[in-house]
Amino acid sequence: MATAIQPDRGCLFYLMGPSGAGKDTLLDACRGQEVSGRHLRIAPRYITRRAGSGGEDHIALTPAVFRVRVDNGDFALHWRANGRCYGIGVEVDRWLANGDPVLVNGSRAHLDEALTQYGDSLVPIMVCVDFDRQRQRLLDRGRETIEEIDARIARSRRLQARLEHRFATIHNDGSLTHATRQLLAIIDHH
């Protein structure tokens, strides 16, 4: 009986950065891409925010349904930030076991837990943006109040100072094409 050859485990590329840094735009630009001959998987996020609320294309859940999914083990990763619950489905573990590269929209504050869970399979990538540009992007999308925007900028300053120089960093103040090339080069390198 022949033994099936197991593929190398894929890498989990953990994209993080402040609201308004352009993570969702980068994720969309990477959809359908191949990296090192493998299809790049983009993991959907489950969020306790109504669908169509601007910005990120996500799967909307009520807090009660989110809790049930946590209790059922439906999330590979989950966290709270900015008054919402966020989750990444367990399908990412299947994709990684198949050897596929997987790109997720993660959380800076949840990074340590993600590193503990995925170890060397996780590649943190920080997306940075000038704080004035971040503020303008948040105003333009019209989802947050001024107070919420101020709180997000303050959180960005705290977390960016702590994380920016520890990981691969994309400065997303220029063209989308340039930032996407940076991201795909980081992924291709691993």
What function would you assign to each model-found segment?
Residues 16-18:
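P-loop (Walker A) phosphate-binding loop of NTP-binding proteins
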Residues 46-102, 106-108:
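ATP-dependent small-molecule kinase phosphotransfer cores
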Residues 103-107, 118-141:
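Conserved phosphate-donor/acceptor-positioning beta-strand/loop module used by diverse small-molecule
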Residues 32-42:
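Post-Walker A helix-loop "phosphate-sensing" segment adjacent to the P-loop in P-loop NTPases
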Residues 24:
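Walker A/P-loop
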Residues 143-189:
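Small-molecule kinase domains that catalyze NTP-dependent phosphoryl transfer to phosphate-bearing small molecules
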Residues 21:
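ATP-binding Walker
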Residues 12-14:
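Short hydrophobic/aromatic beta-strand immediately N-terminal to the Walker A/P-loop
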